[in-house]
């Protein structure tokens, strides 16, 4: 997946907002490996249907840490790597792994049918949830999360891939958005942050 200027700008905006939120406490280093966005006014809820047609909200996962990633099933690298790392972290956390909920939001509803999405997330963990809205719903949700995505023409006529923000949002057990973890941070860093959030309650 090509990293475009717009994608870098999108990541920069998230990082910039995180810095603004922590400006009043700049002297105290963050305990997290990811970007601490506690108190952010964006990324508040999902409100998209799952593969069974049930509309899902962050609030229903109360008591669990929720890791939300926007991607597409035909993504060759970032998406499967991100989901695999999350599955590995969930397993490595043992009993605490049951308190981690992975949510995959499709940015390509034209190709990602409910059947395709259901099979895709099941490859990583039977507990993971996949969400798929209409084109308009997807656009609106991505905007609420400050997630950038766009079609990129493929090598053959009519084909395309997707360019998108490469990172996940982490919600604490009370349903509040807390972290933005960039792609490439690694499984160990994610495990550290999830365990810390659970410890904090």
Task: Indicate residue ranges for each PLM-predicted region.
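Bacterial signal peptide processing site
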Residues: 25-28
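Structural microenvironment flanking redox-active thiols in thiol-disulfide oxidoreductases
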Residues: 81-141
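N-terminal export leaders
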Residues: 5-9, 13
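C-terminal motif of bacterial Sec signal peptides marking the signal peptidase cleavage site
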Residues: 20-23
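A short beta-strand-turn-helix
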Residues: 46-66
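Thiol/disulfide oxidoreductase modules built on the thioredoxin-like
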Residues: 137-193
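Short active-site neighborhood of thiol/selenol oxidoreductases, capturing the structured segment around
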Residues: 59-80, 86
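Hydrophobic beta-strand anchors of alpha/beta hydrolase catalytic cores
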Residues: 67-68, 102, 168
